[in-house]
Structures are given as structure tokens and as C-alpha cells.
Amino acid sequence: MHISVVGLGVEGQQATISLLKRGYDVYSSDINRHIDLSLLKKENINEEQLDLEIGSHNLDKIFKSDAVSVSPSLFNKDIAKNIIERGLFISDILNKHKNIKTIAVTGTNGKTTTSHMIYHILINSGFNVVLGGNGGGGFSGYNELLLKANEEEYDYMVIEVCDMTLDFCNYVFDIDLIVVTNIGYDHMDVHQSIEHYTEEVEEFIKDKTAVLNSNDENLVKLQNDNTLLFDKYDGKLNLFGKFNLQNADAARVACRELGVSNKNIQKALETFTSVEGRTIKLQYESNEIVSGKTDNVDALKAVLDEEYFDTVIIGTPRKHETCRFNILDYIKKYSPDTLIIFPGLDDTTYDYVQYLNKLGYHKDLRVIKHVDDIIKYIQTLKNKKIFIGGNGQSKITLITSKLID
């Protein structure tokens, strides 16, 4: 079987890797001559089965394929529409997954934890469940999930849906139940406004059963006869933060809708542990540390509002993600004793310092470029409360693992 992959962002590269690992012949293309292919290059792939084209799309090769995977960012473009009209879209060819009871979890923050909670509850209730989704959120991409779901028998499929891929996922998957954790200020370069983002969510949940956050004023406005509300979980939970009580209650309400008993839900959540890269609390020598990805202002605020941290260590976003610089506006108000900046997704530390200077930030500010130097700095601190977060999940996870070891 010959499959084409159109677009080689994170999802496209993940799709290429997933297909090659399964022995498919793959043609992958992207019109951007300067596309970063580091994800593809670090994998041990069979290059003999990969026909890679950078700078253009060969439509003849694409339309002669047995199936075509399209990057979510291209889903509303003409090339995707043409592929769908020709009956070549991969989810229309490999479509067994559409018969599985499917739960989609979306929102600005809490998607990964809530998805894992639902998965954990269902698995511990005796069901066969497949979990996956958004390649930028710690999973191996939508295509990996689709392929897995078509290979074996499952009772349920749980998908983490990125807020920028709602239309794409609505087409690729036959979704039965949607959980929306919250609507916050992230990816505003795509959504343009919180009002427009809310409208996109409203369209996504249309005619479907949806579980919405009663603490989110934008989501409360979307209530209808098909919606259920969640609040804060009041059972035992071994996770840091009030925000995780909301995630747990979202999972509880979703699983009750699926027919899982309260007893099984409570029992499962008692044994649930933090997902790698998400917020965790630990003791390091005499210091109390909370660490986890908080790549937008709402996520950061949710953690920092829990308690006062003397030292805040945050990773920087990509060069083009200036919409995430508003994290610094909140940090100025929060005013930690010491702020450490490190290169998270890109080395935009200089841009962060310049932005803080414009804000008139006068507290102790340092730039530390290397993970080992961050560890060494933490070792000099005594009896401090430290938060490590911001952008750059892989580096945050690495720092956390070194502190635990």
C-alpha cells in the first residue's frame, strides 16, 4: 500500500514515521524549503521506503496513492478538499476506527491530564482502550492513533484534540462525547480572539454530548440540552493544584456518562499519578519544587495562584510565538524574588529580557542557557519554593528528571 503525507510539520513527520514503521511505501512532501525535519531525522526510519520531496507537492504522486494523510494545518486548503473529493483521505480509507466509541478532550489547558484520567478510569474498569492524539502534546500524532485503532479491537478511543485542529478531528474521527476543559488565551495568533475561539468550540460540540467546565464563563454560555457540567472533584487525588481537581471532575462526569460507576471512578482516581511533563510537586534538598509545562498565561496563572514561589524558572517560546509573551505581564505582577529564563522551544531569551525591560521589570532577573547550570543554581538555594515551567516540555521534563534522580 502506497500512502502520501502532505505537509511535514510535527503531525506530518509523526505520520510519516508511523507509516514507515508499519512497512508502508510513503511519499512525503512540504512546500517549505526550510522546513525543520529534525523529528524525522532523529528516527531510525527505512529510507528506501520513503520518497521525500521538499519545496513542492507532486500532485501526480499524491493522487495516484492508495491513501493520503494531510497535515491538520492544511485541512481547510484546496489540496485537502481535492483529496477528500477523490476519496483518498486516509480516514476514509482506513475507517474501522469510526466504529469505536470515541471521547475527544480539548481546551486550552488540562487536555493531556484529563485524557489520561479518562483512559485510566476506563482501563481500570475492564475496558480495552486506545489513547492518543495531538503530536504537539506528548502523543505520537493523530495518524498513529488512527492506525492503532484500525489494527486491533477496542471498546473506547480517547483523543487529545489540539484547539487548532477542531475541524480536522471532527472529520477524521466519529466523536461521541466531547470534554472541553477550558477556553483560555493561547494560540491567539490562530484564533484571533477569545470570542472567535469560543465560536469554534461551539461548532465543534454541535449536536454532540459535551462535558463543559462550570468555572469557565465562556463555556457556560455554550450550555444546551446536550451538555453536562463539571466542577471540582471532591474525592481523593494525589496531584498538585486546584486545576487538577477540575480535570478529575471532567473525567468523572465523562466516565459517568459512559456508564462507569462512581465506585470504580473513585478507586481509579486514587491511584492516578501525574503524566510525564505535567505539573508535579517534589522535595529537593531543603527546597520545595513544583515543575510542569505551563506554556500560556492561563496555565501559568493556575499554578502560581496556588502559592507564592520565591524563584520562578521559565522556558521561552518559539520565535514567532509572540502571543505567548503575555506570560511575562503576569510574572511582573506576581513579582517573584528571582526570575530565571532559559531557552525552552527556541532561544528567545534575549527577546524575553527586552520585553521585561519594556515592562519596567526591576527584580532579580537571570538567563541560564543550559539544563545542568539550572540544576547547579538550584543546588545553591536553601529553603526556597521554586517553580519550573513555561515553554519547552522536553527541557522541563529533563530538569525534573535530574532533580528526582
Residue ranges and their predicted role:
Residues 1-35, 62, 68, 260, ...:
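ATP-dependent carboxylate-amine ligase
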Residues 2-104, 372-377:
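Short, basic phosphate-binding NTP loop
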Residues 6-8, 28, 192-195, 210, ...:
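Adenine nucleotide phosphate-binding catalytic loops in nucleotide-utilizing enzymes
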Residues 41-54, 80-89, 100, 175-177, ...:
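Active-site regions of enzymes building and remodeling cell-envelope glycoconjugates
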Residues 18, 22, 61-63, 72, ...:
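Phosphate-binding loop of NTP-binding sites
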Residues 10, 109-113, 245:
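Residue-level detector of alpha-helix initiation sites
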Residues 73-75, 163-165, 184-186, 216-217, ...:
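Short glycine-rich anion-binding loops that position phosphate/pyrophosphate groups of nucleotides
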Residues 5, 25-30, 52-53, 67-70, ...:
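Short, hydrophobic beta-strand segments that form beta-sheet elements in well-ordered domains
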